Structures are given as structure tokens and as C-alpha cells.
């Protein structure tokens, strides 16, 4: 079966094994097939939450995002990470190969 829909009491479930699965709703929850772990929860006009191994790690807020745990940022070929201070000033943060850290106004 490529696509299944079933209802279990208070909730409706969908299982897709081929192609895109496009879902619309005011609250969308994605979880393991056996519901043992959550992946993503989306709530209209509210937070989007992303989970890792059952623990909330990334959440959108009205002012930005909240990251729980470590955040690893790779810069690729760019020249650092740009951070904005509370007063709106932007700073470029660069970590050199030898581990030295430098900042400069953008």
C-alpha cells in the first residue's frame, strides 16, 4: 500500500510510502510510525518545534528561535557568522583554523 489513512478515536493518521505527502492543518504533528518519538510539531500562529530523540531542540518564537543544547554553525566559504546585538549593531564572528576568535562590526 502506497498511502493509508485511518482514524483512531481522537486522532487521524496517514502513512505514505511513495512520493510527496502534503498536509494542511492548524496543528501538524510528525512522529515515528509507532508514535514513540516526535519529530516536528507545527501550530498555526505559534511555535514550530523540532525534536531529536524525543527532546525538543529547536523552537520558533515570536522574536526568533530558541535552541536547546549546542548549535554548530559551519561557515563554508563565507567569512564568519554575523550576530546582531540587542541595540541592532551587527558583528562578524570569525574562528580561525588555529582557534583564535575575532569580531568586527559589519
Q: Model regions: which residues?
A:
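Self-maturation zones of extracellular/virion spikes and adhesins
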Residues: 1-56, 64-106
Amino acid at each position: 500500500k502506497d498511502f493509508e489513512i485511518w482514524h483512531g478515536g481522537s486522532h487521524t493518521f496517514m502513512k505514505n510510502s511513495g512520493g510527496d505527502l502534503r498536509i494542511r492543518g492548524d496543528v501538524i504533528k510528525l512522529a515515528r510510525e509507532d508514535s514513540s518519538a516526535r519529530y516536528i510539531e507545527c501550530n498555526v500562529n505559534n511555535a514550530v518545534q523540532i525534536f531529536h530523540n524525543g527532546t525538543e531542540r529547536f523552537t520558533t518564537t515570536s522574536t526568533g528561535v530558541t535552541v536547546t543544547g549546542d548549535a554548530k554553525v559551519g561557515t563554508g566559504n563565507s567569512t564568519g557568522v554575523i550576530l546582531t546585538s540587542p541595540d541592532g549593531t551587527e558583528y562578524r564572528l570569525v574562528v580561525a583554523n588555529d582557534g583564535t576568535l575575532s569580531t568586527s562590526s559589519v
